[in-house]
Swiss-Prot record:
Keywords for the protein's UniProt record, in alphabetical order: ATP-binding, GTP-binding, Nucleotide-binding
Alphabetized NCBIfam families for the sequence: PRK05416.1
Source species, domain of life: Bacteria
A Pfam entry, by short name: RapZ-like_N
Parts of the chain that traverse the membrane: none
Protein name: Nucleotide-binding protein BamMC406_2713
Function statement: Displays ATPase and GTPase activities.
Sites where the protein binds GTP: 57-60
Species, as recorded: Burkholderia ambifaria (strain MC40-6)
Length: 302
């Protein structure tokens, strides 16, 4: 059975992700107590259901400590994937304010005896971060701070389409002016490279467009940067595998996340497709939803 566990911070988009999985044919359950999960998986498997998605958050805080052990145990019999959704505190506060929803931990006792009850939304968010932080290491992280709901749905679909027999490497382009991604395991700054933005004909385009590709591809310094990053990844990927890592997010950043980072993320993803399962996604580039995230295969290699 394929089991997808969705966890993370309240307000980060778990409901959107769960709905996307339901549309993909998964049997979905929200806020399931972790200790019930093995029994539910057996029950559904006996009934012929082969895809289960479960959202777990701070509302199950009393039994969150059980979840890491359950993940290891379930992985012995099932294809278990963990999706950890995160967002900046500023983005979360704005979302709760817009929806007028109450945070699950608002008014709950603080872990600091000097504070008493968690009176502010920010305190509740930070308390929840502490509670769910141990789960982040088990899953693939997505920072939804700047994502539209339809983009998140697409990224979730790409996540479940990927094979699960090897390390999954996610190349993510972004713009520093919009903030660094919270989900990055490795981050490379390519702002030292010549910027197509200053060519008025290239400015409205992205690193997916042929004129920008031709501009950057003609520059030796761009290839030096790509070669150096690729060599670093090839050296250290075996060590990430030995550490039993399932997911690795490599963030490539330029100023606006539109030209250089997009081109380099695409090029690196194509190069690495022979050596790992690869997804490339573009956080800030003005591209259509389908182009914002895609699987990369060996046929994409240059």
């Amino acid at each position: 059975m394929r089991i997808v566990l969705i966890t993370g911070i309240s307000g980060s988009g778990k409901s959107v992700a769960l709905n996307a999985l339901e549309d993909a044919g998964y049997y979905c359950v929200d806020n399931l107590p972790p200790h019930v999960l093995p029994e539910l998986a057996r029950y559904l498997a006996d009934g012929g259901q082969h895809r289960l998605a479960v959202a777990i958050d701070a509302r199950s805080s009393a039994s969150l400590d059980e979840l890491p052990g359950l993940i290891r145990s379930l992985s012995l019999e099932h294809d278990v994937r963990v999706l950890f959704l995160n967002a900046s505190t500023q983005a979360l506060i704005q979302r709760f304010s817009e929806t007028r929803r109450r945070h699950p931990l608002s008014g709950s006792p603080s872990h600091d005896a000097n504070i008493g009850l968690l009176s502010s939304l920010e305190e509740a968010i930070e308390r929840e971060r502490d509670l769910v932080a141990p789960l982040a290491e088990f899953g693939h992280q997505i920072d939804t701070s700047t994502l539209r709901a339809n983009v998140l749905r697409t990224w979730v679909k790409r996540f479940i389409e990927q094979k699960n027999n090897d390390l999954m490497v996610m190349f993510e382009s972004f713009g520093f002016k919009r903030g660094v991604p919270l989900d990055a395991d490795l981050m490379f700054d390519v702002r030292a490279l010549p910027n197509p933005y200053y060519d008025h004909e290239l400015r409205p385009l992205t690193g997916l467009d042929q004129p920008v590709i031709a501009f950057l591809d003609a520059l030796p310094i761009v290839h030096q940067m790509i070669d150096d990053i690729h060599a670093f990844l090839m050296k250290w990927l075996p060590h990430f595998r030995e550490d039993n890592r399932s997911y690795l997010t490599v963030a490539i950043g330029c100023t606006g996340g539109q030209h250089r980072s997009v081109f380099i993320a695409e090029t690196l993803a194509a190069r690495l497709a022979h050596d790992a399962n690869v997804i490339v996604r573009h956080r800030d580039a003005p591209v259509d939803v389908d182009a914002s995230s895609r699987l990369v295969t060996e046929v994409d290699r240059p």
